[in-house]
Amino acid sequence: MLHSSEEYTYSCILASMNLANWDKIKDSESVFIATVFLDCLCQDFINKSEGVIGLEKVRDFTIKGRAIGLGAMGFHTYLQANGIPYDSIQATLLSNKIAKHIQDESLRASKWLAKKFGEPEWCKGYGVRNTHRTAYAPTKSTALLMGGVSESWSPDAGMVFDMASAVGELRRIPPAFYEKMKEKGVYSE
């Protein structure tokens, strides 16, 4: 829970790891780099909001805590692509492993940032740069923009459905499901 009061308005700069690409993410510096990137966005906001009327409370909050929220999307897409049932023990163990990886790597990055650039006021004595590092937010729009992967850690609500958009009705077929159906020769327009 982010702090908010008469004195401060909270901010949290968000991004999500696309878990449809977990096999590439797990052995890379992606989470570390994403955490550094989000902290850089905090600094960019701090720099650009200086003297802007109406942003004083949120700017002060960002200066003192540098809250970021690195989350995830595409978990169900990864499971589908790899033939792992969503409600299986294997999926549960994998989700725990992924969440731990994101938590550990974002903490490692926050500690590195604190050593390199210092701890903000609300983190003094803790050896970290960010009061918050992870946030598993809904990612409906982002997931759609990333090729129609599943939202956050959630399963797709349906496998084939029509969706209203600014350009009209769109037929939505999750990419991993679409590939599996083509593979099995059971998909048709």
Language-model region placement:
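Long, C-terminal-biased catalytic regions of enzyme "large/alpha" subunits
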Residues: 1-189
